[in-house]
Amino acid sequence: EVKYDKLSINLTNYELKVNGKVVDTPPKEMELIYHLASNPNRVFTRDQLLDEVWGFDYYGDSRTVDVHVKRLREKLEGVSDQWALKTVWGVGYKFEVKDKN
């Protein structure tokens, strides 16, 4: 389980909670947010995410990642100012966690 301010991601039972309430989230979105949040502030390219979340045998379009990120943002937008799902232009995505200092 990965926890941040107002967010809990439990991959064991595929449960995403925002403010303590379960948010309906498809399996790949769960796996994607879990992967990003488990590696805070690390930038992943679309290809890395496809390999690491979808698997090496995935032959779909890399824009699949964009669609899943968009859907996650719709669920998580404005929940906390301590973390955010960020686009790193020209590179990929990261789960950005603010420094507590």
Regions found by a protein language model. Give the residues of each.
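A short, conserved alpha-helix in the catalytic core of glycosyltransferases
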Residues: E31-A37, D66-R73
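Conserved catalytic core of two-component sensor histidine kinases
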Residues: P26, Y59, D66
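DNA-binding patch around the recognition helix
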Residues: E1, D24, V69, R73-N101
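Alpha-helix N-cap and coil->helix boundary residues
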Residues: F44-Q48, G60, T64, S80-W83, ...
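Short, flexible micro-motifs
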Residues: Y58, R63, Y93-F95
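Short, Lys/Arg-enriched segments at the junction into DNA-binding effector domains
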Residues: E1-V43, D47, E96
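Short helix-coil junctions and helix-kink-helix linkers
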Residues: E52-D57
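A short acidic, leucine-rich amphipathic alpha-helix
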Residues: Q48-L50, L72
